[in-house]
Amino acid sequence: MIIAIDGPSASGKSSIAKALGSRLGFKFISSGYFYRIITLIAQKFTLNEYDLLSESKILELVLQNDIKFNGVDFLLNGVNVTSHILNERIDLQVSLYSSYIGVRNIVNKKLREIVKLKDDNYIIEGRDITTVVFPEAKVKIYLDASVKVRALRRYNQRDDDITLNELEQALERRDEIDQNKEYGKLKLAKEVFYIDTSYKCLDDVCDIIIKTFNLKKK
């Protein structure tokens, strides 16, 4: 069974998906980490956050590198890069690279291969997970929150010099990009269960999703 969790950046997708995985005994996968690894690959060949590779070049580089998920960590050519893909520079570019249709096709294929390779129960989170990648998921959840709340969450996770106001502006730009993508845009899927997490704690959101999950099982 698949529980698919969609929604904008910093809406709580990863934290809630991980907690749900622990409570339900499901395996957790984040599509966003794949896009971040691809952005990390690109940044090895660029000078700064304003320097972007073409779609054809990034696809060429992706095919030259081995990206894997071992059930816990994300590996690039056998090296654990999970802790290296959450930084401001990647934040600024990941939406741009993930807007490339070829890049999205590669990530979506990897996600489907992971699920197909081992018949198991999965919680998979990411933008367009409920609309494009796994529209057939038994349970589809869309998590949302205000920009101010999402910026504060991201601010509390960071240890760099970015300000709260800068994070708000970055999230607003990212929302605009994600909502206007030609392919895989951020939107509500059919039969999706919408949850505003702005003023809900993690356990309360998990309880709501588990109730939905139990109803869908019947």
Curated annotation (Swiss-Prot):
It is an enzyme of class 2 (transferase). Keywords: ATP-binding, Cytoplasm, Kinase, Nucleotide-binding, Transferase. GO terms for cellular component: cytoplasm. InterPro entries: Cytidylate_kin (IPR003136), Cytidylate_kinase_dom (IPR011994), P-loop_NTPase (IPR027417). Pfam families: Cytidylate_kin. Belongs to the cytidylate kinase family. Type 1 subfamily. It catalyses: CMP + ATP = CDP + ADP; dCMP + ATP = dCDP + ADP. One of its GO terms (molecular function) is CMP kinase activity. One of its GO terms (biological process) is pyrimidine nucleotide metabolic process. Transmembrane segments: none annotated. It is found in: Cytoplasm. Its main location: cytoplasm. HAMAP family: Cytidyl_kinase_type1. Its EC number is 2.7.4.25. ATP binds at residues 7-15. The lineage of its organism: Bacteria, Pseudomonadati, Spirochaetota, Spirochaetia, Spirochaetales. This is Cytidylate kinase. It comes from Borrelia hermsii (strain HS1 / DAH).
